[in-house]
Curated annotation (Swiss-Prot):
This is Leucine aminopeptidase 1. Monomer. GO terms for biological process: proteolysis. Binds 2 Zn(2+) ions per subunit. Zn(2+) 1 binds at residues 187, 206, 272. It is an enzyme of class 3 (hydrolase). It comes from the Eukaryota. It comes from Aspergillus oryzae (strain ATCC 42149 / RIB 40). Belongs to the peptidase M28 family. M28E subfamily. SUPFAM superfamilies: Zn-dependent exopeptidases (SSF53187).
């Protein structure tokens, strides 16, 4: 995730780097990149610039959002706060008894175990060998969840979506009676902005927290025999994107292909950073889910608010993250309705991201459980919605 608030890290990149590098663990065989290679980034709708990879990381250190459109230059669809798609979402929760029963099966222990392992990889940088290894581990976990639920016998699948940079994205698909599809997303990659190819990037919050949150929601959702057996009206997909930190590269590739295939995507919810609440508490704010209200679909965002109200023990607070702050941007770019949830209001989110100090010890698994509940509620209600 890209935080628009000025990071405490960026006093000036060079001065901070001198202080930080000695404390960072090094990777034995860093990948070497071509210093002069240029990338076309978009910093706002139709505002583009050619930059080197090092310049990309410098922008991120300064809290500047962008999407890398080097390989995906198709004209975008740019929703504003007041725009809404033609999709009509439920105005009330229709499956409270079923969803509440499923949320009781969600556990913090699963998320903590998974996140401990996920953060043990030196880095999940999308061009690194350990980024491939972490993706492989995650793929195997998703596959196990599907197989153990019995959903594989009814057509549920998990696939690797290959990319040129090495780390693949992951797509779990739970078919319904129609091809109308609801997508739940998080990004699996991490980054250390000082030296991405070399330094450790545990990425516990960004976005290890979102990754294990939606994985736990998948576990819970597949406890429903109706869903697992493919009897829900609509199809549900869970996505774990590669290369979000590079400019939403993985999610762009996926939604570009979906657009070419004329896939009927009715909703996409991104969760990026779901575990840090201390910033909000320190600021005198209540623990709550942060819901983006800029560059998202208005109708879907209202539905998301209703889900939080119905199924979570915390409320929500509206917030803004600017253009291109996470992978929901890619869904919007190709005309699909998207929404975005995070751990708090943006000014109170985790400032340790993109360093070696983005660690589990700062996170609240109680809060992550609330995000898992909203994910499960969102998925189940829309699995049975009449679109």
């Amino acid at each position: 995730m890209k935080i628009r608030a000025a990071l405490a890290l960026s006093a000036t990149a060079s001065g901070v780097l001198a202080a930080v590098v000695p404390q960072q663990a090094l990777l034995n065989n860093p990948q070497i990149h071509h210093e002069n290679e240029k990338y076309l980034i978009e910093l706002a709708p139709y505002q583009t610039r050619w930059v080197t990879e090092e310049e990309k990381w410098a922008l991120k250190l300064d809290g500047v959002n962008f999407i890398d459109i080097t390989e995906e230059r198709n004209p975008g669809f740019y929703p504003t706060l007041h725009q809404a798609s033609n999709v009509r979402y439920p105005t009330k929760m229709e499956h409270v008894e079923e969803v509440v029963g499923l949320t009781h099966r969600l556990t913090k222990a699963n998320m903590e175990r998974d996140l401990e392992k996920f953060t043990s990889f030196h880095t999940r940088y999308y061009k690194s060998q350990t980024g491939i290894e972490s993706a492989t581990w995650l793929y195997n976990q998703v596959q196990t969840v599907i197989e153990q639920s019995g959903a594989a016998e009814h057509g549920a699948t998990v696939d690797r979506f290959a990319h040129s940079w090495g780390q693949f994205s992951i797509i779990a698909r739970i078919p319904g009676k129609s091809n109308k599809t609801v997508v739940l997303g998080a990004h699996q990659d991490s980054i250390n902005l000082f030296l991405p190819s070399i330094l450790a990037a545990p990425g516990a919050d960004d976005d290890g927290s979102g990754t294990v949150t939606i994985l736990e929601a998948l576990r819970g959702l597949l406890q429903s025999d109706t869903v697992a057996q493919g009897k829900a009206p609509n199809t549900i997909e869970f996505h774990w994107y590669s290369a979000e930190e590079g400019g939403m590269l993985g999610s762009q590739a996926i939604f570009s292909q979906y657009k070419q295939e004329r896939r009927d995507i009715k909703a996409m919810l991104q969760q990026d950073m779901t575990g840090y609440v201390q910033g909000a508490l320190n600021a005198g704010r209540k623990e709550a889910v942060g819901i983006m209200i800029d560059y998202v679909d208005r109708g879907l965002t209202q539905f998301l608010k209703d889900v939080v109200t119905a199924y979570c023990n915390v409320g929500y607070l509206e917030t803004k993250c600017g253009y291109a702050c996470s992978d929901h941007t890619s869904a919007s770019k190709y005309g699909y309705p998207s929404a975005m949830a995070t751990e708090a209001e943006m000014e109170n989110t985790n400032k340790r991201i993109h360093t070696t100090d983005d660690r589990i010890k700062y996170l609240s698994f109680d809060h992550m459980l609330e995000h898992a509940k909203l994910t499960l509620g969102f998925a189940y209600e829309l699995a049975f919605a009449s679109f």
